[in-house]
A protein has these predicted regions:
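A short pre-motif secondary-structure segment
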Residues: 121-125
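Conserved RNAP core-binding helix
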Residues: 21, 31-48
Length: 178
């Protein structure tokens, strides 16, 4: 993601709020919390626009992640698992290729099943496309922690998705036999 200068806060919101909402949803697993998180993030970014203007997306992302971590600490539990959100223009897919995944719901459910730290790492590394070092900086941890959390998360996602594909295969086999 290249650095882009925005002429105004309004332009920034118009161009980037949908992507920030997607990230908030993937971090929280809950549409309502994601919308609240986005609103608070944008408000804090606006209040500090003179500081944020140089790199507003990075600034807003940091606020978003910090608010998400604060929410998790306050609740003392991982995000609520959620079903696939309703489709709509205000919550786009991760990228064009993501729409082609037939098992989008399974991917979102598997992501929701990860512990908060692993979920954050996966979202930041693979959805936001941040490097290990950028992710570590954003989460205030070491690069080694990001790498180990990523490895654990990917292993768990493979297990969860293998379970899904196994149950789908059993269902298809049963349906054919009927």
């Amino acid at each position: 993601m290249g650095m882009r200068m925005f002429a105004s806060f309004d332009e920034f919101v118009e161009e980037r709020s949908t992507a920030l909402l997607r990230t908030a949803f993937l971090l929280t697993g809950d549409r309502g919390h994601a919308e609240d998180l986005l609103q608070t993030t944008l408000l804090r970014t606006l209040r500090r626009w003179s500081k944020a203007r140089a790199a507003p997306e990075a600034y807003a992302r940091r606020v978003l992640v910090n608010l998400s971590k604060d929410r998790l600490r306050a609740r003392g539990r991982q995000p609520r698992e959620t079903a696939l959100p309703p489709d709509g223009p205000d919550l786009p897919s991760v990228d064009a290729g993501y729409d082609r995944i037939a098992d989008r719901g399974a991917v979102l459910d598997a992501l929701a099943g990860l512990p908060p730290g692993q979920r954050q790492v996966v979202v930041l590394r693979f959805v936001e496309d941040l490097s290990v070092d950028q992710t570590a900086d954003l989460l205030d941890c070491s690069a080694g922690t990001v790498k180990s959390q990523t490895a654990r998360a990917l292993t768990r996602l493979r297990e969860l998705l293998a379970d899904f594909h196994g149950s789908q295969h059993e269902k298809e086999t049963t349906d054919v036999r009927r």
